[in-house]
Amino acid sequence: MSAAWLAIDGLGLTEGSTRIIDGVSLQLGAQRTVVLGPNGAGKSTLLRLIHGLLHPTGGSLRWPQTLSQAMVFQRPVMLRTTALANVIYGLKLKGHTATECEQLARQSLARVGLEGLAKRPARLLSGGEQQRVALARAWALEPQLLILDEPTASLDPASSREVERIINDIAASGARILMTTHNLGQARRIAEEIVFIDRGRIVEQTPVELFFTQPQTEAAQRFLKEESP
């Protein structure tokens, strides 16, 4: 594995008497990491802790170097405006001029195949198109780390394939990818490394092919058996 870009030590999140994330320790160094686990295992919560949307009740996250980040959710928020303006919004917050914002936003929409829908109200787009707008909005910011939480969970197969293509293109541009998915085929196509979480604890962290061919724990073996078609 490459040098770690994130070291997590004893990370925990407790709500009342419930431990949602329970003493997670791991180092992330792969360019493309997919977090797998059963429903309620803590996958999305872990990603939100890493992105800073939630504050841990214990442990620490250490970044050897600061990485610019963007996060895309299963159901992205679309502003009540055009697809183009949705992408421009983030660029404007980053301090680009109006001319730069429009140029960069149009380029980003073109990269996800939506240049022809730039002036369409974003909330009238299909679910797959909205997810591509969200990816364009994130990609326009040139993040060094892109975090994706179930980016294709609500999409049809064709839209899912298109989103996968875009994720791979973003990775090819140099960004690190950290994502969750329930689609095992998708995980195998995208990931270099699998982190398997169960009941808030990291159970396995292995190269993708090793995880799918020789899972080391009963929990992972059971998960693959239950989730495989």
Briefly describe each language-model feature range.
Residues 51:
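Helix-to-loop junction immediately C-terminal to a conserved catalytic motif
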Residues 181-182:
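H-loop/switch region of ABC-family ATPase nucleotide-binding domains
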Residues 99-117:
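Conserved ABC ATPase "signature" region
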Residues 146-149:
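Catalytic Walker B motif of ABC-type/P-loop ATPase nucleotide-binding domains
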Residues 157-159:
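Helix N-cap at the start of a conserved alpha-helix in ABC-type nucleotide-binding domains
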Residues 121-125, 129:
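Conserved ABC ATPase signature
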